[in-house]
Each structure stands twice: as structure tokens, then as C-alpha cells.
């Protein structure tokens, strides 16, 4: 902790591991370009630091969700190709053009607005086309996309990329994935001049049929397992530590936390951490989460509150479980996937919620 911020958690982000993960995914992609998804502040790791680290590793194409994220990405990555996945909000075309950003167009209305802007400017500006193959969120249907191929609707647009998004690529042998792969291949064949991109983190490991010319990993870059149920080929990127504020011994029958939802089964030693759900640590992990103190797994007891977490450190060495020491909530064998599972959610949500008040440290 710094002298001005002695409370709270410390989020350590290993940019060397981030770069190594990109290189591992690029190797797996076997000839396809490996882009990087850096939306949601690079999954909570900091777009201003993660983006340049990925650029230095060799990444040249980046994806974000919002225009505001793209503006931050452009400031950090002046030479990169940057696509905005959530498309073209009405009236936003000038901002895209002024910052050399590329919208991912997913409806006839967006295509018409972008084309009209290009005509008015006398420029054919680049954009991606989004075809929906099963997610039913954003994108043209396969039939709508096929109707555009070779037609006048795209004459004024420098369409550069065709994308879709896999629903459940992490599920081996998934029938929905097989159908998406086939539908996307059918549409991609009608746009031979466009780079095609289907594979996400898990899709990168599905072989050439799901990769096409570009893969777009996100979660795996930041240490998430792209193949749940199997060994994680990615290196951990994020570590979360919190300071122990106080240690106390409690007798059998003592309760801890709001609503007295935990009762000591015997004499226990409890440590209170300077961390809570206001820091993005999930309240849903109450009674299920764990932390590591001096190599020992210690259960979270009682209800996780806004600013504090209670650990049962009875089995941890007393010299380690003391005021001012640190407990590790992500790291030391506790990966983001496990933390998510213990909170009844996914590691993506854990990553993107962290760091609201945490001190950040980067390993370059």
C-alpha cells in the first residue's frame, strides 16, 4: 500500500504474462492474424497499459465494445487498427472518422448511415460487417448478409472484415458451434475480399474451420482458461491481495458478519481484510470463497460486506496471519475461473469488476 492509501486491496497485473498469452494464442492460430479484445478497460487490467503491452508483443488489431473505449484505445495505440463491436450509434460517424476507428456494422440501418456518411465525405471508409449465426444479440442474419454481397448497399463502404461470435465454443462437440461454423463459412464465401473472423478465445483452439483469417481472443489473454475442464494453457495475469486489518480469536458459537450467517464450530481465529464488494469482490462468494495466507487456503466466513471480508485463519501460521500482512484472493493457485465458480458466476465478471479502489501495480 502507498503512504496515501494504506487501506484497500492491491491488484497486480503482469504485462509480461499478458504478452506471453498473446504469443501463445498467435501460435495456436497457425497463420491467422491474432487480434486482441481490450473492451471493458482491457477486462479490468487497464487499457492504457494492456494495449501497448500487446502492441509490443506484435498485436496490430484491437476490438473494443464502446466508442468511448475506442477513444482511449486510440490514445494508447496511435497506429493500431481498432474496431468497435457495438456498432454505429446514430450520429456518431464523424467521431469514428476523426479518430480512424472502424465500426462493426450489424444492421441495414447502420450500413445505410455509414454509407451515407462516406458518400457525403467523398471517402470510402473502412468498417466491419457483423453476421449473427446464433447469438441473437447484434448482427445481420445470414440471409441479410448474403443479400448484401455484390450489391449496391456496400459500394460506398470500404468493408474490410466479416465477423460473427461463437455461442459455446468452450463446449466440446457442441452442435450449436458446428452449425455456426457452417453458417459463417457459407456467408464468408460470398465475401471473398473480406478478412473473416469467427474464433474467440475458445474458438482459437477449434482448428482452422473456426479460425478463418483472424481470431479475436479476449478472456484467455488475461489468464482465463479457454478450455474449461482441461489444463489452462494461459499464464496468470492478475493477482489480488488485501491487507489484514485485525485478527481476533472467537469461542465456539460466536457469529461473524451481517445477519450472523456463520457460527464458529469451535475456537477459531478470524482475520478481517480491507476489501469488499465495493472493490468488485463478489458478495455472492460469501461462505464459499477462499483466500491464501502463507500457502494455506483459508475460507471466507460470514457475509462479504462493502469494505470488509472475514477469513478463518485458524490453520494459517500465526506469524503470517497478523495485522498488516497480506492475504491473496486471486493468485497462489486461486485462479480467476475458480474465484468465479465459487461466487456462482464466471471469471469474466470477476475480472471486469475488480480495481475500483484497488492500488494497481504493473509488472513490465
Swiss-Prot record:
Residues annotated as binding substrate are 137, 306
Where are its TM segments located? none
Quick check: keyword ATP-binding in the entry?
no
Which pathway does this polypeptide act in? Amino-acid biosynthesis; D-alanine biosynthesis; D-alanine from L-alanine: step 1/1
Keywords attached to this Swiss-Prot or TrEMBL record, sorted alphabetically, are: Isomerase, Pyridoxal phosphate
Question: Is Isomerase one of the keywords?
Answer: yes
Which GO MF terms does the UniProt record name? alanine racemase activity; pyridoxal phosphate binding
Q: What does this protein do?
A: Catalyzes the interconversion of L-alanine and D-alanine. May also act on other amino acids.
- Stated family: Belongs to the alanine racemase family.
**Know the name of this protein?**
Alanine racemase
Source organism per entry reads Methylobacterium sp. (strain 4-46)
